[in-house]
From Swiss-Prot:
GO biological process: protein insertion into membrane; protein transport
Cited NCBIfam families: PRK01318.1-3, yidC_nterm, yidC_oxa1_cterm
Annotated family: Belongs to the OXA1/ALB3/YidC family. Type 1 subfamily.
Organism: Neisseria meningitidis serogroup C (strain 053442)
Name assigned to this protein: Membrane protein insertase YidC
Role played: Required for the insertion and/or proper folding and/or complex formation of integral membrane proteins into the membrane. Involved in integration of membrane proteins that insert both dependently and independently of the Sec translocase complex, as well as at least some lipoproteins. Aids folding of multispanning membrane proteins.
Primary localization class, coarse: membrane
Species lineage: Bacteria, Pseudomonadati, Pseudomonadota, Betaproteobacteria, Neisseriales
Localization in the cell: Cell inner membrane
Gene behind the chain: yidC
Cited PANTHER family: CYTOCHROME C OXIDASE ASSEMBLY PROTEIN COX18, MITOCHONDRIAL, OXA1
Amino acid sequence: MDFKRLTAFFAIALVIMIGWEKMFPTPKPVPAPQQTAQQQAVTASAEAALAPATPITVTTDTVQAVIDEKSGDLRRLTLLKYKATGDENKPFILFGDGKEYTYVAQSELLDAQGNNILKGIGFSAPKKQYSLEGDKVEVRLSAPETRGLKIDKVYTFTKGSYLVNVRFDIANGSGQTANLSADYRIVRDHSEPEGQGYFTHSYVGPVVYTPEGNFQKVSFSDLDDDAKSGKSEAEYIRKTPTGWLGMIEHHFMSTWILQPKGGQSVCAAGDCRIDIKRRNDKLYSTSVSVPLAAIQNGAKSEASINLYAGPQTTSVIANIADNLQLAKDYGKVHWFASPLFWLLNQLHNIIGNWGWAIIVLTIIVKAVLYPLTNASYRSMAKMRAAAPKLQAIKEKYGDDRMAQQQAMMQLYTDEKINPLGGCLPMLLQIPVFIGLYWALFASVELRQAPWLGWITDLSRADPYYILPIIMAATMFAQTYLNPPPTDPMQAKMMKIMPLVFSVMFFFFPAGLVLYWVVNNLLTIAQQWHINRSIEKQRAQGEVVS
């Protein structure tokens, strides 16, 4: 395998890795025409829960939330510091229950039989508009007494934060002990957020982290299979004393935090039960049932949990709960992408600009890999210098493949050339390249981050395609520095590849293209220097080792 074939192989593998899930998604099973009575009840319950809302609006410096007064659901959440993907004049909407998509947070109290004791009761609030007063704003929703229980649901929003505390205040005047559990749920449809593309696709769907099962993704297609078969076979831990669970998408997430970092688990009274399922043809949910300590007659109690609904900012989410940063989708190379992003973040803290930090990171990675790349490029340079002799052998022996191969092997021996010498070092670099790709692609920190001039958002494509065109030019330059393929078909392919890559990179985030451009420029400089050095040695009659 020569360098050209390896480059083509790596390019194709990278494209397949990035685009496969988007280009060839797992088909969703067609819902069965008949539903059981239980399925119909679940569907009716879900649709009723998402009926038109009576809005209560809460505004802080980071979010604008809409709570349905009757159900107490968090029905809409706008992230005021982030722009919409498709319209920079509008803020980004994470939760919503409009015609476009459904994505809401719900919470209920259940009796010992699992029935919602607040069903059909409804809450009320003293006012419809809330805003920050100091560092916090509290929204108290009160329900009429039911089963001898007085229940309030309280939302607390904090300045500068995307954490929302959801608390039930319970006063038991029923004359008997109340055995309850709190059920916290995130419901959404399977629609893809704006910005998903063929080559820039990230996971969308339920996730759960537990000490027993670590981080697990539960795809919509797995839940469809469960719904179709009537079984619950999706792989995730269903009972845990701690952890977190929710939904993630590119750059953003919503998760119920069972145990805040350094705090007590909400599952202290007993293991929490996790349930992730398809609710009906349109909606999916991830929920956790938290058992509460028995509430004696005349006593008061509370059930409190934090909901994080916001950006996947590593420095923030890492301090909220153990391993919450795993929700940042680095694909299958999290172990490599995470330290690379850590280094990028440290550089940004020093430089103050993500674009320049990417450039410095690229230089550092190139320097670390220099021993590997130097060996590879020297091998390629020797192959390039021997190209005229290889071509002469090909012309001399024509179609006699055996004689041609023997002559070429003799030439390699005489010239001290290892035809595979450039392959292993390049193969060892592939994890680095893939890790860097995911570190840059998945990082919300680059969203809306400018570099210079026309690049005002490193997470979006170059609006004028300047970087992709420069990248294509650098790839063309590399083809002239590398040894020409002996196969005419390979030669044509290597000339076409820069054009194909440039078109593909038109749709890549500018931060990714910036990395490739800088990496290519450094590679050209290194290869040019090595080629010149070897040609000079040969001209002086020295043996090139």
